[in-house]
Amino acid sequence: MRSKFRMLTIMATTLVMIFVFAGCGNSAKSVKGETFDGGNIEVFVPEGWKAFHGADVFGDYEEGYDPNTVSIGKGAESELDLFNKPMVHITYSGKDRTLSMPSKELYKDGKDIEDIKTSDHTWRGYTATSVGYPIAVLFTEDGDEQIQVAVTLENGDEKISLEDADVLAILEGIKVKK
């Protein structure tokens, strides 16, 4: 009787441990969301975030928006919310222009960060303060093409970090349409 009780206790403890550890971690792969077609790039948009096409400021594009730029706001309902919510702003160089990594000296308190590796890219970058807001700037190259990501880490009452599963899922989900 005692050994049966001990065996049941061990099995129950093992099952509890499996469920506890299965729920741990900040895996980008476990984030739910959908793909947004930005034109020349596709991006992953987690639930609770909303994506917007880049503005065609000079009327250069047939689409009526910049197909190389996407902004994704956490908790955003409209494009105006991008001014008071944490956001990720993605810019792709396109095939006929070149982007370069913005200098951290342009910002206050610029500090290099460790590279962030996703399945398709290795992102290098830094954190800094821009107009009083904590930001991160990331950059990667894919042959002759580049992608720059600017992350507003705090805005309004909300904060995000580069370690958040949502942010990692966004970085993982940036795909250049070939």
Describe each PLM feature range:
Residues M1-M11:
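Bacterial N-terminal signal peptides that target proteins for export
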Residues A12-M17:
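Core hydrophobic alpha-helical transmembrane segments of single-pass membrane proteins
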Residues F19-G23:
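C-terminal motif of bacterial Sec signal peptides marking the signal peptidase cleavage site
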Residues A28-D66:
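N-terminal "mature-domain start" segment
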Residues A28-G33, W49-K50, Y107-I113, H121-W123, ...:
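Short glycine-aromatic motifs
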Residues D37, F44-P46, F52-G54, G73, ...:
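A structural detector for beta-sheet-dominated domains
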Residues W49, I147-K178:
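Surface-exposed amphipathic alpha-helical segments
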Residues A55-Q148:
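Conserved polar/disulfide-associated segments of primarily extracytoplasmic proteins
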